[in-house]
């Protein structure tokens, strides 16, 4: 088996990280399951060696012995002698998720680890759903943190929240243009903004390409955030800052990544699917799309292409679905 099974493990795939698990634990679990699957495969036929074995002479009534050339299997490659054929795999991790966060986590095996670098260089956006709770503030911006303050929120309306979100998106879009090294007054900056293809040229602070409210039922609200160069803790702090702008307080109840670049929830393998065959199939299915999208996005960063595929466009350039 060996080489053929390993050959189908070269590339990128996505898993769904549950909340409460460290990304390192996810990687180690996936590696363990892959090694178990690889080592359970039927081994290839052992090599045959010629040995001269002592035996009776055929057709002779006398008890004479002679040496006979015989082909016997070599035991040097037997798994009971050599041990497991695969002892470790090098698995790379894409944009990480902290312990409390859940959602799409991109992993790489073999040459796929170099594709992770290409993903970083393309500065692709990521989508999150962020659940907030009005009326309280904590030391870590999370619902389970140490309570600092309680406030009223009866004055908060959906319209007021939408205005705050529009202000946040507008300020971040200006920052996005600045970090893209485009002239704010140029036609190129305008056209790229309309097409949703503006990307920072280098590392930058968290940039929000789009933010909107999906659900508002005080004290709870649900946001969808499209961003890049973020951490999950920065998204929790964003909820806190939105609360302050609303003249109240707010904490974050949940951070869930629904898309990382061109990997969405539909691509993410659940924990019950972290096995050799499911991961091999996921890598093979994603490979053409990965190559195509990376080529488009890296060409865009080089200035050779003016349109980004729909997976990374801000919502302003998509058809809005009814909420």
From Swiss-Prot:
Region (Disordered): 302-323
Nucleotide-binding listed as a keyword: no
Family statement drawn from the similarity comment of this UniProt entry: Belongs to the pseudouridine synthase TruB family.
Subunit structure: Forms a regulatory protein-RNA complex, consisting of RCC1L, NGRN, RPUSD3, RPUSD4, TRUB2, FASTKD2 and 16S mt-rRNA.
UniProt subcellular location: Mitochondrion matrix
GO biological process: mRNA processing; mRNA pseudouridine synthesis; positive regulation of mitochondrial translation; tRNA processing
Enzyme category, top tier: isomerase
Species this protein is from: Rattus norvegicus (Rat)
This protein's UniProt keywords: Isomerase, Mitochondrion, mRNA processing, Transit peptide, tRNA processing
Transmembrane segments: none
Enzyme Commission code: 5.4.99.-, 5.4.99.25
Domain of life: Eukaryota
Name of the molecule in the record: Pseudouridylate synthase TRUB2, mitochondrial
MF GO annotations: pseudouridine synthase activity; RNA binding; tRNA pseudouridine(55) synthase activity
Function text: Minor enzyme contributing to the isomerization of uridine to pseudouridine (pseudouridylation) of specific mitochondrial mRNAs (mt-mRNAs) such as COXI and COXIII mt-mRNAs. As a component of a functional protein-RNA module, consisting of RCC1L, NGRN, RPUSD3, RPUSD4, TRUB2, FASTKD2 and 16S mitochondrial ribosomal RNA (16S mt-rRNA), controls 16S mt-rRNA abundance and is required for intra-mitochondrial translation. Also catalyzes pseudouridylation of some tRNAs, including synthesis of pseudouridine(55) from uracil-55, in the psi GC loop of a subset of tRNAs.
Active-site residues from the entry: 98
PANTHER family referenced in this protein's UniProt entry, alphabetically: PSEUDOURIDINE SYNTHASE-RELATED, PSEUDOURIDYLATE SYNTHASE TRUB2, MITOCHONDRIAL
Annotated SUPFAM superfamilies: Pseudouridine synthase (SSF55120)
Cellular component, GO annotation: mitochondrial matrix; mitochondrion; ribonucleoprotein granule
Pfam family, one: TruB_N
């Amino acid at each position: 088996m060996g080489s053929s099974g390993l050959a189908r493990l070269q590339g990128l795939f996505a898993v769904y990280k549950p909340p409460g698990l460290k990304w390192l634990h996810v990687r180690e679990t996936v590696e363990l399951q892959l090694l178990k699957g690889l080592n359970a495969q039927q081994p290839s036929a052992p090599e045959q060696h010629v040995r001269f074995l002592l035996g009776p002479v055929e057709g002779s009534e006398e008890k004479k012995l002679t040496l006979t050339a015989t082909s016997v299997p070599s035991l040097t490659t037997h798994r009971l002698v050599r041990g497991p054929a695969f002892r470790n795999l090098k698995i790379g991790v894409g944009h990480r998720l902290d312990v409390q966060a859940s959602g799409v986590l991109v992993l790489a095996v073999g040459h796929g680890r170099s594709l992770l670098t290409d993903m970083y260089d393309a500065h692709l956006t990521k989508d999150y759903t962020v659940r907030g709770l009005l009326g309280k503030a904590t030391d870590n911006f999370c619902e389970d943190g140490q309570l600092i303050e309680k406030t009223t929120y009866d004055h908060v309306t959906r319209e007021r929240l939408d205005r705050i979100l529009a202000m946040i998106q507008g300020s971040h879009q200006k920052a996005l243009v600045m970090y893209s090294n485009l002239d704010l007054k140029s036609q190129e900056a305008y056209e790229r903004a309309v097409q949703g293809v503006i990307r920072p040229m280098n590392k930058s602070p968290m940039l929000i390409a789009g933010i909107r409210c999906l659900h508002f039922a005080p004290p709870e609200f649900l946001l969808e955030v499209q961003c890049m160069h973020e951490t999950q803790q920065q998204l929790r702090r964003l909820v806190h800052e939105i609360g302050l702008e609303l003249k109240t307080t707010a904490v974050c109840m949940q951070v869930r990544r629904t898309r990382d670049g061109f990997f969405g929830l539909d691509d993410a393998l659940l924990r019950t699917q972290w096995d050799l065959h499911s991961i091999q199939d996921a890598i093979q299915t994603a490979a053409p799309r990965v190559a195509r999208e990376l080529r488009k996005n890296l060409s865009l960063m080089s200035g050779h292409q003016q349109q980004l595929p729909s997976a990374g466009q801000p919502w302003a350039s998509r058809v809005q679905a009814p909420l």
